[in-house]
Amino acid sequence: MASSCSQALRHHACKSSKILRIHLQKSWTNRSFAAYQQPDVSSQEEIVIPKKKTWSKEAVLQALASTVKRDPTASDYRLQDDSFLTPKTASDFKLFCRSQESGRNAAKYFINKYPKYFEKDYAQPHIPCLMPETLDAQLEDVSEAALKERIQLRKVKAAVDLYDQLLQAGTSVSLDLTNDLLDLICLYGEADPVQETFEAEQRSEEMEDIQDETQTKKGRSPKASDLLKTSWKENNNAERIFGLLSEPNTRSYSALIRGMVKHAAYTQAFSTYTDLLNNRLKADVHIFNALLAAVPAVRPKYNEKWELILDLLKQMAEQKVKPNLLTLNAILKSLRRCGALGRSQAFPVISEMKVLSIEPSLASYNHLLAIFYRSGAQVQTPTDVLVEVMNEVSGKSFTPQDPDDAQFFTTAMRVCLDTKDMEQAYRVHELLGVGDNWRFMGSDFQQSIYYAWFFSLLCMMENIDVVMKWYRDLVPSVYYPSSNAMSDLLRALDTDSRLDLIPKIWKDMKQLGHGNRQQLVEEVLTLMAREKHCPEVQESFADCALDIMKMYDTNERGKVIMSWTASSLSDVTTILLAANRKQEAWEMLKLFRTHNRVPSAELLNQFVTCVKEAGQVSQAVELVQISAAFCLSETPKLIQRVQQEFELSEEHKNILSDLEIQTFNGD
């Protein structure tokens, strides 16, 4: 009975809820709320499902990285592992980077030496450089497959030996594979690339050490052409293998000619090109690019160089070879060595290339600036060329297209420094922050030169507030200033009469490793001792001078020991006297005799003035004795002044009389 009643109630409730739902739906359709209006069947639009976009695994990281800017208070990204080991000087930074690179090379050696212990890949996404490389050939038989493997591994000597074995065995090697071998030999020469790179690193380190000492403003980055002076030997493996070809094609000639140009065999390259034409073959764009770059080496006069360039371009047109960006850059690079003729032809060449839809790259603009602005020469070119270049490149993000792209920013900043154009320097630096343009800064050496020129121009052209703003932004997060740069900063402080900042700058000098640079230290002392300031500034100067004294007394291993000069002793003493540090100044006066230095008469007169204010007659007489001991010509005048301005006892009068007689007899 109870169960039948409950079932009846449940059935009635369900029926009531259905009736209520139907009623509500009818009432909602009569209302004007758009959210509940049923769309018309005829007005339905077809839903188009967009195509799936595939994102790289680094896309999120790249998006996050684009939202932040460089933190001027943070260290370089390479130094984030251990903040306690962060270098504070340029030499420490170089040592740190080399040590870090040495550690990477050691790790890479063990990974490649014992690959079986590093088979599991933990990195997500995959990082190829953390996994073992295949450096040893797996195929030991004498076959084309084994030769192809050695070419891919860039084993120059092993590939040449295997090629000779194939020919001795009577096995013919395909022309394409032989051309691959020629490409390898002509690129690396007779040596394997690993050995070549090691030697290049050693020579690069030696060159940087020399240039760091001798060049700061006039320096340039070491180029590969300076480091690798491999010569093209006659009848080398490339020429021998090329001679064994029964019917060499254009690619064979291209490899040989490009190799000759790369290794400075320019005359042989043009001779080989003549052989190509005699065999009724057409050159490709790579051959013409190499020959255009070699023009300055085979023609001595400017007009002859330009005529040869025109002749090569005409031959390109006759052979229907379309030029590319590297063609433009090769022409501009050759025009850099054509003097005034190059300046007259540079813009027409760029205009002609633009007609062919060839847009200049950063390397093109770098060559253009080098054509119009000679490094180290008296600048007579109007700055509108620099302005036109910056108008073309401003706001653009560039991608690498030419190895010389990395030279643009250094060249542009050098031109800004030579022309004293601060506005364009700001534009160059602004361009550096657009997109991934920072990747074109090149090596650490190039980066240091770029910032050295930029900072030197700031010190020369801007007021000290702007200079200090950039100084705090750049140092030491991206730039370790040299002693010359710190000297420029001191001159900027002197120009704007902000010598009160010298104590802060001195602390930075010590931190940056310039505390033992005697010329720079003496410049700091001279500026502080030159004129008097308010008592607060004089107190800070005195503390700074006493701190500098410690640098003279410090004898740390591996650091240059500074020697006291008469001017440095006089400057420190003058600074202490100006701050009413008489006792400390008196101790400094004793150092003149200790280091065999002679104080100036002006310094002794300053001492007499301070002693007079304190009423210390004994010290005044002692000053006269010191002057007489050094046989200064001003001693008689000093005796007379003490006799007139001080109340002397009989003992003091007798001492001065004896000194006066000794001085007279000495004269």
UniProtKB/Swiss-Prot annotation:
Which GO terms of the cellular component aspect does the record hold? mitochondrion; ribonucleoprotein complex; ribosome
Give a yes or no for keyword Ribonucleoprotein in this entry.
yes
Q: Where in the cell is it found?
A: Mitochondrion
Q: Tell me the first and last residues of the signal peptide.
A: none
The record places the transit peptide at: 1-11
Q: Where are the PPR repeats?
A: 249-283, 284-323, 324-360, 361-400, 482-516, 565-599
An example of a GO molecular function for this protein is: rRNA binding
Give the matching InterPro entries: Pentatricopeptide_rpt (IPR002885), PTCD3 (IPR037387), Rib_mS39_PPR (IPR055063), TPR-like_helical_dom_sf (IPR011990)
Disordered: annotated span: 199-226
Question: Which BP terms from GO are recorded?
Answer: mitochondrial translation; regulation of translation
What role is this protein assigned? Mitochondrial RNA-binding protein that may have a role in mitochondrial translation.
Q: Give the family this protein belongs to, as stated in its UniProt record.
A: Belongs to the mitochondrion-specific ribosomal protein mS39 family.
Name used for this protein in its record:
Small ribosomal subunit protein mS39
Q: Native species of this protein?
A: Danio rerio
Show the taxonomic lineage: Eukaryota, Metazoa, Chordata, Craniata, Vertebrata
